[in-house]
Amino acid sequence: MAPTVLVVDDEASARAFIERALTQEGYQVLVAAEGEVALNILRSTKRKVALVITDLVMPGMGGHAFALEVGKLPSPPPVLYISAYEAPRGEMSKRFLQKPFSVAALSQAVARLIPQEVKAK
């Protein structure tokens, strides 16, 4: 079965772009418009989520606060941060894509962050 990616972004056009690109790459994609909904998906889905992609700036729970909550889950998936604003510094910058980004850049980032053993299943 293809790896599952959860996409969290308050912009419908961004969610649709990422969902379409990842589906064409063969991934299963779940989407949410806000952090609280995404946490509910992570807690309730039967699928093993291999990667979470989250916008950093969203109404309500922002991407960083959401990622901290994801980290508290059993076996948390890696998180890829996206934003149209300035790139974060430090460790987070290694898992960041500046909007707008190309399908190729998204594909490379996703492939880098999903563990090899997940891709092999």
Please report, for each region that a protein language model flagged, where it lies by residue:
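A Lys-centered signature of the CheY-like receiver
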Residues: 99
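Receiver (REC) domain active-site loop signature in two-component systems and cognate sites
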Residues: 58
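Charged docking surfaces used in two-component/phosphorelay signaling
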Residues: 16-24
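Acidic catalytic/metal-coordinating carboxylates
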Residues: 34-37, 61-66
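Active-site residues of response regulator receiver
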Residues: 55
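Acidic, metal-coordinating helix/loop segments flanking the phosphotransfer/catalytic sites
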Residues: 31-51
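Conserved phosphotransfer cores of two-component systems
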Residues: 43-47, 69-76, 85-89
